Amino acid sequence: MFIESFKVESPNVKYTENEIESVYNYDTTELVHENRKDAGGYQWIVKPKTVQYHFKTDTRVPKLGVMLVGWGGNNGSTLTGGVIANREGISWATKDKIQQANYFGSLTQASSIRVGSFNGEEIYAPFKSLLPMVNPDDVVFGGWDISDMNLADAMTRARVFDIDLQKQLRPYMEHMVPLPGIYDPDFIAANQGSRANNVIKGTKKEQVERVIKDIREFKEKNKVDKVVVLWTGNTERYSNVVVGLNDTMENLLASLEKNESEISPSTSYALACIEENIPFINGSPQNTFVPGLIDLAIKKNSLIGGDDFKSGQTKMKSVLVDFLVGAGIKPTSIVSYNHLGNNDGMNLSAPQTFRSKEISKSNVVDDMVASNGILYEPGEHPDHVVVIKYVPYVGDSKRAMDEYTSEIFMGGTNTIVMHNTCEDSLLAAPIILDLVLLAELSTRIQLKAEEEDKFHSFHPVATILSYLTKAPLVPPGTPVVNALSKQRAMLENILRACVGLAPENNMILEYK
């Protein structure tokens, strides 16, 4: 059974005019390695423990502005057009049927959660019913692009939407023109130079100041309460992390003053957002968040998240390898081949930008391999190769082919071959939507453990967004989790805790 909404009644939950307050008992474990006489030496001891947390969620949903870096790209035009189509209730003719606008592919808008059972039947509700979230139809879009093409023409260039839909969207989008963007040809492929007719001039510091000015003016012009900025621009090459340049907050800010060339455009946008305490999310694989930038975000308590949208091939990989290792099967070789024909593929044809993507795609299985010391010796890892080629004809319809070779019982071999046609921007757009909505929501949640005196926000390095990214950014010293099921459970269970609901553990003891 599916229900649209619910309210929690519990002595541990209180609804006020502007807040939901909950008391949550977090059951976890503590491990110690102790010398035990009864065991004849050192032994691992696991001690269950319960920590009480208090959560406060501000239920006042703001008017949200979203500024995209690379607004005129395939992702930006697809997301903007998709939200307009949903807001206006647009339908259009395909070769098969009359299609209605929807938010399929969005975790927050199109997935469900289990809330319990009734008369022996499982009861589910929308994910978005857990806590008050911004309605995507109400989001105001803006942003920057190194191309001055309006969003209607950018949509036509992208060749993602059906022609009938494009015609209906054009009047809404032709007046939308991106602000000039930061352009540094040293960080992206040379083939992007032909698009760069809309750029911010000046020193690195002047560029950051211009972005700050743009954010303030966008917020004032559109009368929005909050702004979230997300990078959906070109993949950049990796920045060199150098002692004295960008290794600390002080050195990074000094490098900005000195106009150091190794400060990337994405890092410049992030600097501007942190100075304005605006959430910034990196949707590409480069190392935008150099150590000095992370230091600054932590000091300013300004939300940052990333890296790289997890939409197609990598999402499948994080599910399949988790299944194999969890089943006691040993993946020994993973070969992933992609070809695509959009501008992302064109930019990735340069070796230095491809390397950023290769790192992001390759690290996705690390935590799953490390979790099973029966299958893998220390330091052992599957052979893992990622190939990306640019084929203009296929456009935004990316092809992903994977071969997984695994060792099974008694030296046997199992091979799984998968072909995945990924409509790149149609998969990425709802993920962008989820990222900005969840980033905004997380800024309204505060918590404290029982031994703490004051409420505080989540750590500014937003691990809560991990489900949506290939290479999750985590606070220093925090384990990286890539397994998709664990990431979704973490996100859902944190939001459940905010309304005093137990984590979904699937035990269903009442029927055992």
From Swiss-Prot:
Gene3D superfamilies: NAD(P)-binding Rossmann-like Domain. Its EC number is 5.5.1.4. One of its GO terms (biological process) is phospholipid biosynthetic process. It is an enzyme of class 5 (isomerase). Pfam families: Inos-1-P_synth, NAD_binding_5. One of its GO terms (molecular function) is inositol-3-phosphate synthase activity. One of its GO terms (cellular component) is nucleus. It is found in: Cytoplasm, Cytosol; Nucleus. Pathway: Polyol metabolism; myo-inositol biosynthesis; myo-inositol from D-glucose 6-phosphate: step 1/2. Keywords: Cytoplasm, Inositol biosynthesis, Isomerase, Lipid biosynthesis, Lipid metabolism, NAD, Nucleus, Phospholipid biosynthesis, Phospholipid metabolism. InterPro entries: Myo-inos-1-P_Synthase, Myo-inos-1-P_Synthase_GAPDH, NAD(P)-bd_dom_sf. NAD(+) binds at residues 72-75, 145, 182, 192, 195, 232-235, 283-284, 308, 311, 342-344, 357, 395-396, 424-425. Its cofactor is NAD(+). PANTHER family: MYO-INOSITOL-1 PHOSPHATE SYNTHASE. Belongs to the myo-inositol 1-phosphate synthase family. Key enzyme in myo-inositol biosynthesis pathway that catalyzes the conversion of glucose 6-phosphate to 1-myo-inositol 1-phosphate in a NAD-dependent manner. This is Inositol-3-phosphate synthase.
